[in-house]
Design a protein with these regions (language model features):
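Acidic, proline/glycine-enriched N-terminal capping motif
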Residues: 1-122
Length: 122
């Protein structure tokens, strides 16, 4: 059976990816690096390396209404795609490999969870 999806808890926002250092320079934040480090083995375990491109990527955010009102869906996309690249599920985040990204919310009580899945473009 093809492993084309994974579930991750507590998605991080792109707003939390960078931390300022001297003179306006930005570096990846400690929180972002810890999130990547925690979720990298989960993605590698749950998903197979994709070998045929391009793909359609679907991101489903399972969270309560309060969390959804405080977080922008577009800010959740970049860290998730970065995670797929770091896990070597996809080689790069360009349109050569990802043709379409859809994001949707589904109400669920409890901690926010995200489901990442893909289908091949026909």
């Amino acid at each position: 059976m093809r492993k084309n999806a994974c579930m991750l808890e507590n998605p991080i926002s792109a707003n939390q990816m960078y931390a300022p250092i001297a003179r306006g320079k930005m570096v990846k934040s400690k929180k972002y690096n810890l999130w990547i480090e925690k979720n990298l083995p989960l993605v590698k375990e749950q998903m197979e390396v994709i070998e045929s491109f391009p793909i359609n990527l679907e991101i489903m955010i399972l969270a309560n209404h309060l969390w959804c009102m405080k977080h922008d869906s577009d800010n959740l996309v970049k860290p998730l795609i970065d995670l797929l690249v770091k896990a070597e599920i996809i080689p790069d985040d360009t349109s050569r490999y990802i043709e379409n990204i859809s994001v949707r919310y589904l109400y669920m009580p409890g901690p926010p969870t995200v489901r990442i899945s893909y289908d091949f473009v026909e």
